[in-house]
């Protein structure tokens, strides 16, 4: 696997019918916050993005990974970073997007979030007709961090509204959806250090959820 650490900033289809033809090469762009950088995993390269790339590498001759991972970034900041990255001429075959949690925590208005997400999806879709996969937001209120110290901005009602926005924009831009909203938030999947980020097991679970959507979309075999 050829790894392009272009943007891990320390601050981080085939035919219209039937299965798509499996690719020989995949240019993979992973967009997200600290989770996409592997925070919570030990080492960071055991994070969910890298686990996805490793599984792809088992089935494809060449996988080039460009992680655009910016800790604490909201969706507007990620969109701005994607705009700059796309100016380099990158043409991804696969894009994963996991954003929204930071927007919820920061108290952003859901309509503003949806506008920013639409800009992001539109920008990506303008560049690639490849596979774009986005995850929604799990129930943050069940994380140890927010059980112990509740936040008025982190409510089930707001999370549901943000997830509705993600679902609507994903449908509009032919983005496949990974539904994490119904996944139980188990303490054994969460880092003991901050009660927020996924630990090794959590990153593995997230990778598995993404791969359930990614592999068939690329015409690849399910995980063994």
Which residues are covered by each model-predicted region?
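Serine-esterase "nucleophile elbow" of acetyl-processing enzymes
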Residues: 17-71, 84-88
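C-terminal motif of bacterial Sec signal peptides marking the signal peptidase cleavage site
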Residues: 13-15
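Alpha-helical cap/lid subdomain in secreted, periplasmic
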Residues: 81-223
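Cell-envelope and extracellular/periplasmic
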Residues: 69-73, 99-100
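Sec-dependent signal peptide recognition
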Residues: 1-9
């Amino acid at each position: 696997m050829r790894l392009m650490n272009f943007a891990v900033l320390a601050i981080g289809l085939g035919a219209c019918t039937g299965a798509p033809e499996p690719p020989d090469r995949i240019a993979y762009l992973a967009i997200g916050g600290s989770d996409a950088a592997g925070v919570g995993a030990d080492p960071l390269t055991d994070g969910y993005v890298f686990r996805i790339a490793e599984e792809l590498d088992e089935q494809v001759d060449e996988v080039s990974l460009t992680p655009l991972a910016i800790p604490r970034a909201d969706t507007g900041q990620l969109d701005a970073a994607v705009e700059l990255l796309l100016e380099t001429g990158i043409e991804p075959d696969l894009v994963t997007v996991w954003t929204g949690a930071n927007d919820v925590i920061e108290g952003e208005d859901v309509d503003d979030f949806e506008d920013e997400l639409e800009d992001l999806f539109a920008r990506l879709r303008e560049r690639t007709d490849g596979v774009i996969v986005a995850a929604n937001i799990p129930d943050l209120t069940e994380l140890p961090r927010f059980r112990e110290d509740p936040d008025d901005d982190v409510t089930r009602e707001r999370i549901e509204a943000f997830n509705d926005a993600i679902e609507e924009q994903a449908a509009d831009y032919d983005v496949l959806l990974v539904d994490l909203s119904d996944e139980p938030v188990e303490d054994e999947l969460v880092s003991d250090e901050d009660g927020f980020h996924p630990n090794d097991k959590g990153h593995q679970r997230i990778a598995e959820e993404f791969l359930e959507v990614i592999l068939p979309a690329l015409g690849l075999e399910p995980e063994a």
